[in-house]
């Protein structure tokens, strides 16, 4: 098969594109000297990508540094294994970059685009770099068998589809304990109150200010550089085991990652002291701190409530109610609530008498000691 090569001018360089047919042939042949780089936003990559591709989404702050020429391409990878793979192979492999749809890329801004900038930088570093004509959308339309999709296809056909999060179209699975597929960190727009009634869909689109320096948010908030700058956030507490710290290599943010999934077996309370210390460090430096998990309604809420309990000497109920007044769709899993009850006892705090109307009793256990607790409704409206 003859590969179609099309010259694409940018700056003073000449880039070459590869066709989707050529790429399909290389994948069919099992070409091990092929390095695919997906230049789309991470949520699109997580949703679906060409097999074996590694993601190289570029935040605005790092794009500016790349334009200035003082940042190597390897620094753009958020995962160590991707960075190592690129470093080992970029000098010998054929590097092919793709975005969502690059068929008209050469007619637009050329070197001002992300593809143009990356191609020039890769060639400057001695790589044999090309871009994929038509991008991911064209390849997926013609050769879907060589695309990896993160939708859960194991559900019975008779079962209704589960909610799909806005973060890259990841489908939530109720029978998986993995972080991304946890049914407990569910779509905020589908959250329900303690009586099962739907909460308002008019939830804040930005992180919620709990205290003047403390913000509660979701994964999307942690990737929005404009939002982080607007709220003066320089510290980011990531309460997930596998969501990347997107701006870690930029050097302008301090991260702490708590590797906890939203599952009944997880002991989040063991991380309370270091999480509280991290938040206090941000406060001491007059910086904003964002506490986030995936959907911003379970793990990050638990940590935020624990912080309020310790620093403001509040009972679990009172601290929970403060957070709920700020963000009505919070919903920590019951075992995390049990750990907060343990934490309340450790702090020597006690909840005041609750005069609210009784609701059906709920029970949960904590993974640390397997005690069983009876819980009244913690939701106040």
UniProtKB/Swiss-Prot annotation:
Catalysed reactions, semicolon-separated = O-phospho-L-tyrosyl-[protein] + H2O = L-tyrosyl-[protein] + phosphate; O-phospho-L-seryl-[protein] + H2O = L-seryl-[protein] + phosphate; O-phospho-L-threonyl-[protein] + H2O = L-threonyl-[protein] + phosphate
Example of a GO biological process term: response to growth factor
Q: One Pfam annotation, family name?
A: Rhodanese
The record's subcellular location field reads: Cytoplasm
Description of what induces expression: Up-regulated in local wound tissue 5-7 days after surgical incision.
What GO molecular-function term can you cite, just one? Answer: protein tyrosine phosphatase activity
Q: Which CDD domains match?
A: DSP_MapKP (cd01446), DSP_MKP_classII (cd14566)
Q: Polar residues: which segments have biased composition?
A: 189-203
Describe the inactivation phenotype.
Mice exhibit a persistent state of mechanical allodynia following plantar incision. This allodynia phenotype is concurrent with long-lasting spinal phosphorylation of MAPK1/3 and MAP kinase p38. Tissue at the local incision site also shows prolonged expression of phosphorylated MAPK1/3 which persists through to post-operative day 12, although levels of phosphorylated MAP kinase p38 are normal.
Q: In the UniProt entry, which residues are flagged as the active site?
A: 293 (phosphocysteine intermediate)
| Keywords, ordered alphabetically | Cytoplasm, Hydrolase, Protein phosphatase, Ubl conjugation
Question: Which spans of this chain does the record mark as coiled coil?
Answer: none
Please name the PROSITE patterns in this protein's record.
Answer: RHODANESE_3, TYR_PHOSPHATASE_2, TYR_PHOSPHATASE_DUAL
- Residue span(s) of domain Tyrosine-protein phosphatase: 206-349
What EC number(s) does the entry state?
Answer: 3.1.3.16, 3.1.3.48
Q: What is its main location?
A: cytoplasm
User: Which post-translational modifications are recorded for this protein?
Assistant: Ubiquitinated by the SCF(FBXO31) complex, leading to its proteasomal degradation.
Q: Quote a single Gene Ontology cellular component term.
A: cytosol
Q: What class of enzyme is it?
A: hydrolase
Which residue range or ranges hold the Rhodanese domain? 30-148
Under the subunit heading, UniProt states:
Interacts with MAPK1/ERK2.
Family listed: Belongs to the protein-tyrosine phosphatase family. Non-receptor class dual specificity subfamily.
Q: Give the protein's biological function.
A: Dual specificity protein phosphatase, which mediates dephosphorylation and inactivation of MAP kinases. Has a specificity for the ERK family. Plays an important role in alleviating acute postoperative pain. Necessary for the normal dephosphorylation of the long-lasting phosphorylated forms of spinal MAPK1/3 and MAP kinase p38 induced by peripheral surgery, which drives the resolution of acute postoperative allodynia. Also important for dephosphorylation of MAPK1/3 in local wound tissue, which further contributes to resolution of acute pain.
Entry protein name: Dual specificity protein phosphatase 6
Ranked from the top, the taxonomy reads: Eukaryota, Metazoa, Chordata, Craniata, Vertebrata
